[in-house]
Amino acid sequence: KIAGTKGLVVTGIDDEVAQETVLAINTLLNSEAFQPKQPKLTRQGNIDKVNSAIDGIISGKIKGLITLGVNPVFTTSKGKDLGEAIKNLEFSLAFTSKMNETAANSQFVAATPHYLESWGDYEMKSGHFALAQPTIRPLFDTRQFQDVLLRLSGEKLKYYDAIKANWNSTILNGLSWNKVLHDGYFSSGTSLNFTTPDFNNINVSPLHEASSPEMSLILYTKTGMGDGQEANNPWLQEFPDPITRVSWDNYLTISLADANSAGLKNTNTANGALNGSYAKITANGRSLKVPVIVQPGQAKGTVGLSFGYGKRIGLKEEMQTGINAFELYENFKRVQSVQISALEEEHEFACVQLHNTLMGRGDIVKETSLEIFNTKDKKYWNPVPQVSKDHIEFEVTSPEVD
């Protein structure tokens, strides 16, 4: 409140009441960073409709399915049941540029071009448009989904011509198509009519009454791997996580206090490798076996697990790493209540940087424990370096080597 228009309130909670509350607070502050009349349009999914479609396919109410640019068999918590249900549909067709879990269970697969071979247009936020144009000709005998729709609807236009006609009639208002195509973007200056929330009707009691679980699982996407669409790219697999410095894997991050309580640990081997315990995590009746990284600074009572791993379709065997965290993504909520128990097995990590003793570094840094420091002679924990003279070892402080 003191910050006034310079203030901004944000929330990462997947809850409608929390989002409405933040919306109301920023409106009340008249925050300069809050622009409700030009919202970002990058995420327009409807969870209720997606859940309804998934349940309809599994129950048999829906008889046919066409997918484009999505892989629900991999990216939903009911993916395994959904995959079996898709096999039993009367008709299923997957438009995709690469084989994935959904396509593997579909009756028909239609090859689509890569996005660098395709035309497209986007509205990133209200009134701000962009054009995508191919950088190369199609390498294979593929066809864009939009061109297929145009043919099925009886249109003789190509998708490029359809985009051009739509922009000229509804967006450009007489401006030059060639100029916009050259620039790649266009801002119309229009904005949405934003209705100020009724603060008196926002019921915040669910937030106040919400109880915190004993252990919360935070599902997240890694900087390099994302949701796993590019898991067949070895450069992204090799890219180490900026925090844990681990590559080629996902894992359960946990605080030191919780790790000690659960009997989980990380160990360093003599050659500088990092090993870790396995844990069994259970949420909503589903269990996964996951290796553990003890992460300094993590909040007690929370564990983290990244999306994007565990893919088995469309990848070479040596790149089929990690486990699929989407199986715990119940109702598309990134925070889940979980139970954790330690397993006896140990996992070998590909970690590019450890955060404690580095073996084989010689005398760059002297170190010892407090007990040895207090009970042993100095020569035990901090010996004077020696040099060789006439094949005889002398301390570097000896007059013999001057």
Question: Which residue stretches match the model-derived regions?
Answer:
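Active-site phosphate/pyrophosphate-binding segments
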Residues: K1-I58, S169-N173, W177
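A cross-kingdom feature strongest in bacterial/archaeal respiratory oxidoreductases
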Residues: Q38-Q44, N51-L139, W167-D402
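Active-site phosphate/pyrophosphate- and oxyanion-stabilizing loops and adjacent acidic/basic residues
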Residues: L23, T27, K80, N100, ...
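Stable alpha-helical elements in mature extracytoplasmic
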Residues: A18-T21, L82, F145-V148
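Short acidic (Asp/Glu) and glycine-rich catalytic loops that position anionic groups and cofactors
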Residues: I2-T5, S31-P36, I62, K125-P134, ...
